[in-house]
Each structure stands twice: as structure tokens, then as C-alpha cells.
């Protein structure tokens, strides 16, 4: 997971990407965290757990960009789900590499 201090500077290192920005509301409710992420990624609203999120995120191979950048706006010290979402992204990336796609997961404490 990448820590972003300056969004524009960070994004300038990529040429062919699709950006998803997630305002993380819940730092302690897993279902709410997953629901927020699913909503931003345009995934079905019935996704309630990590396995379901993995299954649905595999559909991101359809995104017309090589890099799928997800920036989570949250406090990394307080968000207990960052290691879980990192594992989810790692698993999904194994699938996406067959389609020349990759998810880049980043975290930022503020929208700059």
C-alpha cells in the first residue's frame, strides 16, 4: 500500500489509469467499510465480506485502463481494515494480471 501526500504528484507517475477515490466513513465496521468501497467501485450492494469483495473486484478486468488506482481517504493509524484490503487487492491482482490490469492501492489522510 502506498501512502499519498500529494494526489496530483502521485497520479503524474501513471499514464493509463482509472481513479477511484473512497471517503472511508467507518474505521471499525467491516460491512460498512466494504459497502462504501463497493459503492465507489460500482460493485453490487450485496457484497458483505472479503471473499465476496474479491469475487466482484475480479470484474475490474473490464475497466479500460491498465492501472486501477484506489485511494482510500482514512487515518491509517486508526483503520483496522487496511491489511485486509491489501490482501484482497493482492489476490485480485493475481487474476487481473492475465488481462494486463493492476490495482494500485493507496491511502491518504486528506484530499489534496
Predicted feature descriptions by range:
Residues 50-59:
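P-loop NTPase catalytic core of nucleic-acid-dependent motor ATPases
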Residues 1-45, 60-112:
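N-terminal intrinsically disordered, low-complexity segments enriched in P/E/S/T
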